[in-house]
Regions:
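Extended, hydrophobic interaction surfaces within ordered domains
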Residues: 9-18, 22-106, 140, 144, ...
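Helix-loop-strand module that forms the ligand-binding subsite of alpha/beta enzymes
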Residues: 1-58, 183-263
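N-terminal beta1-alpha1-beta2 submodule of the flavodoxin-like/Rossmannoid cofactor-binding fold
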Residues: 1-18, 81, 87, 96-227, ...
Length: 387
C-alpha cells in the first residue's frame, strides 16, 4: 500500500475523529506492525505514530517485517522478543515519549486577485485532479485561480465523481497482466486510461485530512496499483495545490516527493495557503503554472534523489526475484533496461579487476593512493575545459 496504509484503515481513522471517539483510545498502549518489502514503510509508521499521538495513546514502537519473515526462524524469534518487550511495557506501565505535536490549523480566507498576463497552454492538456467537497473554500478558490492562469484553462476532474466500487484488496492478481478484479465493474480504470494518464500535465489538489489526504484519495492511489510497478505519468509535469498546514507535516511532504520521483514525473511545486497572504498565494500559483509550461516545453525532469534510487532498487529486486507473479512489470522493466544490477556493468568490472590486481603490489598501492584525488576529478575537468 504505496507509502502509507490501506485506504480502508485510513477511513477507520477518519471515522474515529468524525464520531468523536478519541476517548476510547486515550492512554492505551500501542505499536504499529507492518509486513512489506520495506518500501517506504517508515512513512507509514510515521503516519501511524502521529495519529496515535493525536489520540493521546502510549505509542511504544514500530516493527517493520518483510513479507516472508514469518518463514524464517531467526525472524520469528525476533518478533517474539518484540512482543515480549511490548507486553512487559504494558504490564509495567512504562512511560512513552510523544514525538509529534498536534497539528494546528489556522482560520484564513483566501481571496484571489486578477490574473493580468496568462500562461500559454501551448496546446497542452492540463488536468487538475481533486477530491474537493466545498467549492467555496480556500482549496476551491486556489484551483480556480490556477485554472484562470492559463490562456485555454484546464480540465478539472473530481475523484468523488468517479464510480469506484471499493479499495484495493492486495490480491496482486493484476501482477500477471495488469487486469484488476474490478475491471468492468466500475469506472475507475476507464477514467485512468482515458482521462488521467492521457493528460500532458497533472496538478493534484487533494484535501488534507489529519496527517495525510482523505481516505477517498488514498483509495484512488491504491487502485492505481492495477498497473503494478509501471508508471502511468512518466516524463510529465506535476504540481500540488494544498490548503492546510503542510509545514507541520514533513512526513506528508516526503510522501509527495517520493510519489513524484517513483512515478518518473517532474514535481514543479507544492503551493499552499500557509503564507496567509493573498498576493503571495496568487504569485506562487501563477509561477507554478509558468514553470509547468516552461519545463514541459523542454521535457525537463530533474535528476532523482535517494527517494527514487533507493525505491527503484527495492522494486528492481522485487520484480526480478518474483517475475513469475509480476509478469507485466518484468516485461516493462526488461524492455526499458531497468534491471541495472551493478554486476552487469562490464566496464566497471574490468576496471575494478585491473586496479585490484595492480594494488596487490604495496608500492603501487601507495602510488595510487597519492593519485586518487587528482585522478577522480580529471575526467570532469576535461569535460569542463571543453565546454
Amino acid at each position: 500500500y504505496f507509502l502509507l496504509i490501506p485506504s480502508q484503515l485510513k477511513r477507520f481513522i477518519e471515522l474515529v475523529f468524525e464520531k468523536r471517539a478519541k476517548k476510547y483510545f486515550r492512554n492505551k498502549y500501542t505499536v504499529s506492525l507492518s509486513t512489506s518489502l520495506r518500501f517506504y514503510d517508515h512513512t507509514a509508521h510515521n503516519y501511524l505514530h502521529g495519529i496515535c499521538d493525536d489520540l493521546n495513546m502510549r505509542y511504544w514502537t514500530d516493527y517493520s517485517a518483510d513479507m516472508q519473515d514469518l518463514m524464517d526462524e531467526t525472524q520469528r524469534e525476533k518478533l517474539l522478543v518484540f512482543a515480549e518487550e511490548f507486553f512487559h511495557a504494558v504490564a509495567s506501565r512504562l512511560p512513552t515519549t510523544k514525538v509529534y505535536d498536534p497539528v494546528v490549523t489556522r482560520r484564513f480566507t483566501y481571496k484571489a486577485g486578477d490574473v493580468k498576463e496568462k500562461v500559454d497552454n501551448n496546446g497542452r492538456r492540463i488536468l487538475i485532479l481533486t477530491d474537493l467537497e466545498k467549492e467555496k473554500s480556500n482549496l476551491g478558490r486556489m484551483i480556480d485561480q490556477f485554472k484562470n492562469s492559463f490562456t485555454d484553462g484546464v480540465e478539472i476532474a473530481n475523484i468523488n465523481d468517479i464510480e469506484i466500487k471499493g479499495g484495493c484488496i492486495g490480491c496482486v492478481q493484476c501482477g500477471l497482466d495488469n487486469k484488476c478484479i474490478y475491471m468492468g465493474k466500475d469506472g475507475f480504470i476507464d477514467f485512468c486510461e482515458e482521462t488521467y494518464f492521457t493528460a500532458d500535465a497533472v496538478v493534484f489538489a487533494p484535501e488534507i485530512k489529519d496527517r495525510y489526504f482523505s481516505w477517498k484519495w488514498k483509495q484512488f492511489l491504491d487502485r492505481n496499483f492495477y498497473r503494478g510497478h509501471t508508471p502511468g505519468l512518466k516524463g510529465k509535469q506535476t504540481a500540488y495545490i494544498l490548503s492546510g498546514p503542510l509545514k507541520q507535516l514533513e512526513n506528508l511532504r516526503q510522501i509527495i516527493q517520493a510519489k513524484s520521483e517513483m512515478g518518473y514525473t517532474n514535481l514543479v511545486d507544492i503551493v499552499t495557503d500557509e503564507s496567509e497572504n493573498d498576493k503571495a498565494i496568487d504569485r506562487t500559483l501563477y509561477n507554478a503554472a509558468r514553470r509547468m509550461m516552461w519545463c514541459d516545453e523542454r521535457q525537463y525532469v530533474k535528476p532523482p534523489s535517494f527517494l527514487y534510487v533507493g525505491g527503484h532498487k527495492i522494486f528492481r529486486d522485487l520484480v526480478w526475484s518474483r517475475r513469475a507473479i509480476f509478469q507485466a512489470d518484468y516485461k516493462y522493466y526488461r524492455k526499458h533496461k531497468m534491471f541495472d544490477f551493478p554486476q552487469k556493468d562490464k566496464k566497471a568490472a574490468a576496471f575494478n579487476k585491473q586496479m585490484m590486481s595492480l594494488m596487490k603490489d604495496p608500492k603501487m598501492k601507495e602510488e595510487i593512493r597519492k593519485m586518487m584525488k587528482t585522478q577522480a576529478v580529471r575526467p570532469h575537468m576535461e569535460v569542463v575545459a571543453k565546454e
